[in-house]
């Protein structure tokens, strides 16, 4: 049986790079101390859109263009486009259909948008891989993850405003008779923090009738102890390893949610993975939400941490709370 492998991966981020000092001053002026938070999260810099021309869609297009060029492919070579975002620039038409136009896709191309919040791109990767296994018409797929959170962040909320960054990732998946690719995946859903992040705060129906004041179309966030994510991750990953017969020491790169460095290290330790295997990019990129595990994968590939045939573990968690763990052979 053919495997579905990652043929290529590329990323895009805006040129505007912001260090911690900007946010420290911003919150100092409001009487809010964030130095401890930034240190705990492992933040140093992040990239942020600072113009009206860029958004989640344009970042996704840049990442897609980069990966197509890198692979020596054109839009017409792609059989499926999946665009993952929780801040889609458009709801109608879908961003994947717009992407189809931008890359000059073929008439046969399947176009789907995916929103599973911060697990979106990882879930899309898993779901598209399985769809490719079942549908011989799909030889190559383009999976894109891109979020632009800044326009929807409360400037008095340090977790979102100082913790997040803008970036997009794109991967080309390809059917390969000699590859393993996706090995297995597991999901876990626990709605104990169902409404801790809500956007739009009152739902789309009320937004359409009541409107919202400029600068107030923001995520409504209620802080919670995110260490609960660690236990969910550990349970999922241990189950995945047991079901797939995978030894922790065989994992060459752990590409986890980049929200919190302590959580990354804690999960790695609890599942028996050496901390050197855990990839961290949140110090440079901040938390890029849906794309963050694949920004980490890009670093692992570009630095030579992993080679073809190595096993890679993904884990991330999304609003609600839902988490996903995926293991692949790169």
Question: Across the structure, where does each feature detected by a protein language model lie?
Answer:
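Acidic, glycine-rich active-site loops and adjacent beta-strand->loop/helix elements
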Residues: 12, 84-89, 116-119, 145-150, ...
């Amino acid at each position: 049986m053919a495997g579905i492998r990652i043929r290529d991966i590329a990323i895009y981020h805006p040129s505007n790079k912001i260090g911690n000092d900007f946010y420290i001053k911003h919150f100092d002026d409001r009487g809010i101390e964030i130095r401890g938070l930034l240190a705990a999260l492992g933040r140093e810099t992040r990239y942020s859109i600072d113009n009206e021309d860029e958004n989640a869609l344009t970042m996704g297009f840049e990442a897609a263009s980069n990966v197509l060029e890198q692979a020596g492919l054109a839009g017409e070579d792609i059989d499926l486009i999946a665009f993952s975002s929780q801040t889609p620039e458009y709801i109608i038409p879908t961003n994947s259909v717009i992407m189809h136009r931008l890359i000059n896709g073929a008439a046969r191309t399947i176009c789907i948008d995916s929103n599973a919040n911060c697990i979106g791109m990882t879930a899309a990767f898993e779901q598209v891989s399985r769809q490719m296994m079942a549908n011989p018409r799909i030889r190559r797929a383009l999976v894109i993850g891109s979020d632009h959170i800044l326009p929807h962040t409360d400037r008095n909320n340090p977790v979102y405003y100082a913790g997040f960054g803008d970036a997009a990732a794109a991967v080309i998946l390809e059917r390969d008779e000699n590859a393993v690719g996706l090995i297995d995946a597991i999901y876990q859903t626990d709605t104990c923090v169902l409404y801790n992040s809500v956007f739009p705060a009152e739902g789309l129906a009320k937004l359409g009738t009541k409107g919202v004041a400029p600068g107030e179309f923001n995520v409504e966030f209620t802080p919670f102890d995110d260490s609960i994510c660690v236990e969910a991750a550990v349970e999922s990953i241990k189950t995945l390893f047991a079901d797939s017969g995978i030894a922790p020491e065989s994992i060459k790169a752990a590409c986890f949610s980049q929200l919190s460095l302590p959580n990354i290290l804690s999960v790695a330790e609890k599942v028996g993975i050496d901390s050197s295997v855990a990839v961290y990019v949140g110090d440079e990129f901040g938390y890029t939400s849906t794309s963050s595990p694949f920004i980490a994968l890009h670093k692992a590939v570009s630095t030579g941490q992993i080679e073809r045939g190595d096993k890679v573990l993904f884990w991330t968690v999304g609003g609600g709370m839902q988490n996903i763990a995926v293991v692949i052979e790169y």
